[in-house]
């Protein structure tokens, strides 16, 4: 268990790294029961739940935050990530989608699902590439899914992220 003086976040980080994910989540829930107003705890718990594919609970935690908190990092990024979890819901797995897109490059629906799966797998750059490809092939597809996907990813990554800077520039030159 915890060494004295170890912060809660450190304990959770260690449990998580060692694969004791449910214990980490339980510890966070316990802490949140002690301090139900803590935005930091809610955000951390939501992040962990998202990684465990428990999007519904993550969503309600994030929506329980004050609006000002919801609209800035890290909560805004997690909410953006939830959009990708929703897109990936019921989609084929990553490998199947990669094959689908390879066999039919014009399949924007498969590309969008692939991008969502890539985001959830932590491959943000590959996802950005898929959204750029959708935008180039069919800018109006799925109510501008290409552009909206890029913007949601920028939101998730934050303005300072080198990927955001690079792809925002590419988006701008594609649109203008």
Where do the model's predicted regions map?
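Alpha-helical adaptor scaffolds
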Residues: 13, 62-104
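Short coil turns that delineate tetratricopeptide repeat
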Residues: 35-36, 69-70, 105-106, 139-141
